Amino acid sequence: MAPVAVWAALAVGLELWAAAHALPAQVAFTPYAPEPGSTCRLREYYDQTAQMCCSKCSPGQHAKVFCTKTSDTVCDSCEDSTYTQLWNWVPECLSCGSRCSSDQVETQACTREQNRICTCRPGWYCALSKQEGCRLCAPLRKCRPGFGVARPGTETSDVVCKPCAPGTFSNTTSSTDICRPHQICNVVAIPGNASMDAVCTSTSPTRSMAPGAVHLPQPVSTRSQHTQPTPEPSTAPSTSFLLPMGPSPPAEGSTGDFALPVGLIVGVTALGLLIIGVVNCVIMTQVKKKPLCLQREAKVPHLPADKARGTQGPEQQHLLITAPSSSSSSLESSASALDRRAPTRNQPQAPGVEASGAGEARASTGSSDSSPGGHGTQVNVTCIVNVCSSSDHSSQCSSQASSTMGDTDSSPSESPKDEQVPFSKEECAFRSQLETPETLLGSTEEKPLPLGVPDAGMKPS
């Protein structure tokens, strides 16, 4: 009897264990009413309509039919591009997010159990975020030359730039570069600034000094950390051994620096001297021309009658010099004789008469008792009169009278300088008409002229 009872007890225990561990994956799960003051178990929900505790749907599924008092929830799988990530009792699955844009990268694909996740590409940050991933990306700020990155950008924040401090520089446009320190030089060719590094000159203090072999640390200090210090010490001894030839490059540089101002000064000075020389040559040429003009003007004789008349033509001067050889009394007698002779002659012969009258006035001795016929008394006087006819305009009128004096004391220099001056066609007739006795008398009355030897003897008392 004992073995039978043992087997019966084992069978009952197995049934109880099976009942206690029964799986709730059955399609028709019998809901239950919760006890007062208690809640539904895990992965269950309380339905307000049925007032029963019902089971939830697993991720990737949704509730197709809700539970009742007699039936449990009926679940169904999600469609494509939809998902449910948690235990739920929703009637529809959630839609996956839109595809990633060109500035985004898909880090998680869309499945029935998870949504699609997009993040920003490198160099971009998320300007508008969401629960998972980023909705809108923007490019990171790039710091321009002279500015460095103070705070680098992240997936959700932009870059912060700041100006480079003195002694540092940034010569790039970047969203990651920071300000770097200037290189240290013994001799600075171009000093550095916020956007440019310092430039070191190739001429070192070692070359400028005679005992240059002592300055071995030069290669390390001349270049910054970017240069290679290993080959520099090998070149330093060679530079120190070539010290006698070394000072030539600085001397050439200094000569080139001084050559520009010295050449400029010499060029300006030479140009000034050249201009002064040209001006002096022009002045000397003008000064040499003026005495020649004065000498040419001095050759023309100026008689007292010419000075009284002012500036007259050369023809008028030669016409007026005939008057001083006669006295005032002889001119009066000649004028009276011409007045008596004028009515007897016709008008075309007037120029010839006036010319002859002028010749008589020039050669007359001043006799006051001349005959009515116009024949004057000749006393030791020889008159040569050339009369031009007024009808012949092509001929040149000229008169030349020479008086031969009995007195040998008178020198040829005292006689008037008579020159034969050719006249134009119009002047031959016009001059003869203008030079009437009244004109001759008017010109001679301005200043008394000296009388000749024959005139002095016949001067009326």
UniProtKB/Swiss-Prot annotation:
Glycans are attached at residues 30, 171, 193, 206, 221-222. It holds the Pfam family TNFR_c6. SMART domains: TNFR. Residues 208-254, 321-377, 394-461 are annotated as: Disordered. It comes from the Eukaryota. Residues 364-377, 404-414 have a biased composition (Polar residues). Residues 415-429 have a biased composition (Basic and acidic residues). GO terms for molecular function: tumor necrosis factor binding; tumor necrosis factor receptor activity; ubiquitin protein ligase binding. Keywords: Apoptosis, Cell membrane, Disulfide bond, Glycoprotein, Membrane, Pharmaceutical, Phosphoprotein, Receptor, Repeat, Secreted, Signal, Transmembrane, Transmembrane helix. Residues 23-257 are extracellular. The keyword Protein transport does not apply. PROSITE patterns: TNFR_NGFR_1, TNFR_NGFR_2. The chain crosses the membrane at residues 258-287. GO terms for cellular component: extracellular region; membrane; membrane raft; plasma membrane; specific granule membrane; tumor necrosis factor receptor superfamily complex. The keyword Glycosyltransferase does not apply. PANTHER family: TUMOR NECROSIS FACTOR RECEPTOR SUPERFAMILY MEMBER 1B (PTHR47386:SF1). Binds to TRAF2. Interacts with BMX. Interacts (activated form) with XPNPEP3. This is Tumor necrosis factor receptor superfamily member 1B. It comes from Homo sapiens (Human). The gene is TNFRSF1B.
